[in-house]
Design a protein with these regions (language model features):
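Short, glycine/acidic-rich hinge or "gate" loops at secondary-structure transitions
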Residues: 97-109
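Short, hydrophobic/amphipathic alpha-helical patches that form generic packing surfaces
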Residues: 10-19, 82-94, 124-128
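Eukaryotic complex-assembly regions enriched in large gene-expression and RNA-handling proteins
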Residues: 62, 97-100, 121-123
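N-terminal ordered "arm"
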Residues: 1-49
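Long, hydrophobic/aromatic-enriched structural stretches that serve as scaffold segments
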Residues: 42-92
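A contiguous, surface-oriented mixed alpha/beta subdomain in the mid-to-C-terminal portion of proteins
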Residues: 108-260
Length: 260
């Protein structure tokens, strides 16, 4: 497994950089991730400790999410996809626990593997491809929802970073960004900064963010609850972010037309 493909200086990895770089140097990163999970007291929704185990320990008679819910064991392969999954468990344990609980609840309701339903699909989208869009002003979220790309992203990068923060969550999204390309688009979960202020005024607390997001998703949600954001459009996250860059309608989709 080659960790050299990960450029930890990428701005979208800032919240994962310290622990991720440390874990990547371990001779057995899966065991190291389990040790960190134990130190931090990570559990699933039934209070079983989270342990990262080899993929071949997953029985053929049970699905991945159901197994995590039943045992606390997270089947893990030696690849970057599962490395990022472990890293997200370590940074966002409450949200990961809640997503797994939602999956387990839906599996119990609809045991057939051929019937997933809206909730499971939405939980999978969050788990694999979500970014959290934290804004200080509701108007910024409105611009995102309306796909007003120039006003949101191009007009004033300083204003954007003063009023917004984008935190990547989806482990498949993180894996795709190892080899970035312009059209990579996240399913965005919006929330307001005033719910997240730590004791150090104005600073975003990642553990508090985790708890707030877990509480928000707990009642359930569907894929229509997401907004969409081409990740390399975040100001400063890619080169050449000029008018032509954001005018590419195949990536930065125009606002939906509403019928009169």
């Amino acid at each position: 497994m080659d960790f050299s493909a990960i450029d930890w200086q990428r701005p979208w990895l800032a919240h994962l950089r310290d622990l991720g770089a440390q874990l990547a140097t371990s001779p057995d990163w899966i065991a190291a991730a389990s040790a960190l999970a134990s130190e931090r007291g990570l559990t699933n929704s039934t209070h079983l400790p989270i342990v990262f185990v080899p993929q071949d320990l997953l029985p053929t008679s049970i699905g991945y999410e159901a197994h995590i819910h039943a045992t606390g064991q997270v089947p893990t392969r030696h690849n970057l996809h599962d490395f990022f999954n472990a890293l997200i468990w370590l940074h966002f344990p409450a949200t990961k626990r809640m997503l797994n609980q939602l999956q387990a609840r839906e599996i119990h309701r609809h045991p057939s593997r051929n019937l997933r339903g809206e909730q499971r699909d939405a939980a999978t989208l969050f788990d694999e491809n979500a970014a959290i869009f934290v804004s200080r002003k509701p108007s910024m979220t409105t611009l995102l929802a309306q796909r007003q790309w120039n006003t949101l992203l191009l007009a004033d990068a300083t204003r954007f970073h003063a009023e917004c923060q984008v935190i990547l969550f989806g482990h498949a999204l993180l894996e795709k960004l190892i080899q970035p390309y312009k059209s990579i688009t996240a399913h965005v979960w919006p929330l307001h900064f005033h719910d997240l202020e730590s004791e150090d005024r104005g600073q975003l607390s990642l553990p508090l963010l985790d708890e707030v997001v877990a509480t928000m998703v707990a009642p359930g949600f569907v894929s229509r609850d997401f907004h969409h954001l081409p990740i390399l459009g975040v100001p400063g996250w890619w080169q050449g972010q000029d008018e032509a860059f954001y005018a590419d309608a195949s990536v930065f989709r125009p606002p939906k037309m509403t019928q009169a």
